[in-house]
From Swiss-Prot:
It holds the Pfam family TsaD. It comes from Rickettsia peacockii (strain Rustic). Belongs to the KAE1 / TsaD family. This is tRNA N6-adenosine threonylcarbamoyltransferase. The gene is tsaD. It is found in: Cytoplasm. Its cofactor is Fe(2+). The keyword Metal-binding applies. Its main location: cytoplasm.
Amino acid sequence: MIKILGIESSCDDTAVSIITENREILSNIIISQNTEHAVFGGVVPEIAARSHLSHLDKALKNVLKESNTKLTDISTIAATSGPGLIGGVIVGSMFARSLSSALKKPFIAINHLEGHALTARLTDNIPYPYLLLLASGGHCQFVAVLGLGKYKILGSTIDDAVGEAFDKVAKMLNLAFPGGPEIEKRAKLGDPHKYKFPKPIINSGNCNMSFSGLKTAVRTLIINLKEINDTVINDIAASFQFTIGEILSSKVQDAIRAYEQITNNFDKKNIVIAGGVAANKYLQKILSSCAKTYGYRLIYPPIHLCTDNAAMIAYAGLERYNNKLFTPLNFCPKARWSLEDISN
């Protein structure tokens, strides 16, 4: 049986996973660093890298035990090799390449964004091509996923990523880190129409997005408010989340038009939302409704596979393993690595 070992360390989650050729996840271990970074209100790259170094060996032992797998049973080792916080990326990549060398097993360098992009093929086995909205703390872009290693970016944020906007607004409201889940929780208790926030470049006619102005508008409101109590916090969270939904819904329409200009895929019309923001149930509901209007089905992974994980890295490794797309051990990890620059 083919077994793929996946390693993820691009940000603040140390993750190791083993999957089979049948897309079965045998084990998926994630060691979170949230408590280590919470006091700083965000991820500290140096702390993240050092934590990966101390957690990886433990995570590997746990995943082998949980999956009842020996290291010698592993067919290939896939590891995030960019983009991301370069210290953590180097730690994970070096760990994987050391294992590869010692075990004499192939190594596969995985683009972290490709891991997110292919998650829906792991969970739902959808065919190529499909439209992807990649929404996380570090990225926000619409991508035409045409095949393995064949990606066309249709539009992206021109400033902040949507996940970053969630985290920054949460910090303004003195909510816990990470901020996305806290905003969603507070929004359920608030009035989404209490405050009207701007929707930057919503009528631009292209697939690009902007969230910096929205973030600034929230900050300005908070500064000018005389009192900030729980009711106000809930209303701001709800109004902010509502505005994000409006922006993304509008841009999904633009992305569908752009996607249909470059594909002939009119039988199985799928839109995938991936990345940490895909875990937001309000956005899932809003975007599902928008997709349905245009005859598309919105697919989003289970919550534990929306955020950073190694199962998605292992699956991307499986697709590349099946196509014999291996990576030399002298591969240089990358802090920046566009989906369009992936080479097969």
